[in-house]
């Protein structure tokens, strides 16, 4: 059984929900799944005043443990078209893993949330994949195999590079059932492809 880590950063709970959905999909795909989050960098008083969701139940990950998994699905909020600083700070601490080649041939996949529909989701997906590629990871995107992203009748998450969700500037929009379904699809796809690569 392959081991999948869903590693996320979520200030307001949107990516937390997406991470849990991706984990459901990966389990359905036959994987042993762990959900963890990266440390918060915002001071606690500022996070509280900004109404961050501080009651998230996922434990905090450490960079060294990434090597323990066959696949890593990263979920991150987007800031100005890039991954959130909290995720970047965490990934920037993986130089030791890079030096040892510890993540070479492991599977990587990415999901993001943005405040607006055109808030840099695709750029954040791709730039996060770049970090994985520097580690020698094999990228498994959402792809157009997930048909739920097609259509313009409503706001829909998804891109060929990875699943997305839109939160609105005030965080009022929660991930839709279509977006959660896409996260589950991506998680299952990662688990199944990882199993094939490890057989």
Swiss-Prot record:
Q: What class of enzyme is it?
A: oxidoreductase
Feature: compositional bias, Polar residues: 163-177
| Region of interest (Disordered), ranges | 157-185
Q: Which cofactor does it need?
A: FMN
Pfam families, sorted: FMN_red
The record's comment on cofactor binding reads: Binds 1 FMN per monomer.
Q: What is this protein called?
A: NAD(P)H dehydrogenase (quinone)
Q: Name the source organism.
A: Brucella anthropi (strain ATCC 49188 / DSM 6882 / CCUG 24695 / JCM 21032 / LMG 3331 / NBRC 15819 / NCTC 12168 / Alc 37)
